[in-house]
């Protein structure tokens, strides 16, 4: 009898800072898609993000601390070790080499990322290397309608993971931290 393939979720991001929303999405994807683990991959220099980013080594350490109590979550510094901007294609190639052909990969992304996927570097190759999970708020499927259609035109599909809406964002957390306001129960 053949062994079942491993199913690995990849949750990449700036994590500027990591917060409960990231952890909730990872946990829900783990359960909904029968993943063996979720790998958090903080970006050193994210190509699609703002420049007001907490220093990479601190973001990496924050993510490590945030996932410590969950044995199904691990953190990879693969993008931190690269010079310059890091692209998802390079990260997925790395994980394919590490885990081998008996592993299926699922790239977990939020609504804003899903909307921008068609513009990503090497997106066509990415479609061959992983499946995508779009973590969206209830009723927000219309927000990614064009992306769903785009996936369909390429013979691919995107899995939808409806997550509870949280009025919490990394931008709001940075604002609170800058102004000395409490972030208790948010991080």
Residue ranges, per PLM feature:
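Nucleotidyltransferase catalytic core that binds NTPs
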Residues: 1-187
């Amino acid at each position: 009898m053949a062994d079942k393939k491993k199913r690995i979720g990849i949750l990449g991001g700036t994590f500027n800072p990591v917060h409960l929303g990231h952890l909730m999405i990872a946990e829900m994807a783990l359960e909904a898609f029968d993943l063996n683990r979720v790998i958090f991959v903080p970006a050193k220099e994210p190509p699609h993000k703002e420049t007001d980013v907490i220093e990479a080594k601190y973001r990496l350490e924050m993510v490590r601390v945030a996932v410590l109590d969950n044995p199904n979550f691990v953190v990879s510094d693969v993008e931190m070790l690269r010079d310059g901007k890091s692209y998802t294609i390079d990260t997925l190639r790395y994980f394919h080499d590490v885990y081998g052909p008996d592993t299926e990969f699922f790239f977990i992304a939020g609504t804003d990322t899903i909307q921008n996927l068609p513009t990503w570097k090497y997106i066509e190759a990415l479609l061959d290397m992983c499946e995508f999970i779009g973590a969206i708020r209830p009723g927000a499927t219309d927000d990614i309608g064009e992306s769903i259609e785009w996936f369909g035109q390429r013979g691919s599909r995107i899995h939808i993971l409806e997550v509870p809406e949280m009025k919490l964002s990394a931008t709001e957390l940075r604002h609170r931290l800058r102004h000395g306001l409490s972030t208790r129960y948010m991080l």
